[in-house]
């Protein structure tokens, strides 16, 4: 048979298969559109619930914008109401919010640096090293850790972490005080950025651990067995087969943990002795950068009307930053994480059938 006949036969068979598939697709779509009354009620309920979430989110954003505008556009140097309390000595709204944003990002970054290697280590142990029964127990404990209230973590930080880290702070300042990070007079009470970051790291540990564990478990078994069959050790198999597959998932887990850290309030407010300044020191007391959430919690009850608008404005900035971080994490996990390729294949097949 000639090449032209083969191509013609293949084209006819492809056309026939598409023609035979189209009626089935149309029947399936017609069947899906013919819903019973109960299904229609349930569909309306679920659709309304999804729309309600969007309405609530939009309502929160509109509220924050409307309440923050008076403080954002106010003339701070000439407004007497802004020359007292939490807004004293600031020439504009942006001069007020900039050190708060720095403090929020600084504390969260240190917490992420502490929590990420520990969380990934726990996730690897649960998914690849521990016995099945122990893995179940450890997984449950990690999930339960996420349910502990923030104020409990704050009290634990005051009673346990601050006294525990005080000698470490003296040691770091004595031997590494020439580094700006450890410079300054060490705190005598332990109310430092380091203590707050350690507590915050423990609080975000369950998020990073749980997501990383699930991503590690989704690594194709054939990839792992192929690496082991080539003579790789357990660690080499993880490094060559698991980590490349789970890289985007780990990044998303870290970003979601960062989103939690950015909005944490009570633990930071209880532990750190802050000021609204730019500071990178982690061992000092009284000259620590304040976070947005803790500043709102501490000053909102005593603030005047316009000062509250300024605090709400800082909350608007935190809302935007946290929302952006979470969207980025979801996008990375959905676009390049485990299952993304299969989802793209399903969408391509569906498009081909409907063509």
Residue ranges and their predicted role:
Residues 95-125, 254, 323:
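Transmembrane alpha-helix signature in integral membrane proteins
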Residues 213-221, 228, 297-355:
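C-terminal transmembrane helix and the adjacent membrane-cytosol boundary/short C-terminal tail
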Residues 74-98, 153-202, 273, 283-286:
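Membrane-interfacial helix termini and adjacent extracytoplasmic/periplasmic loops
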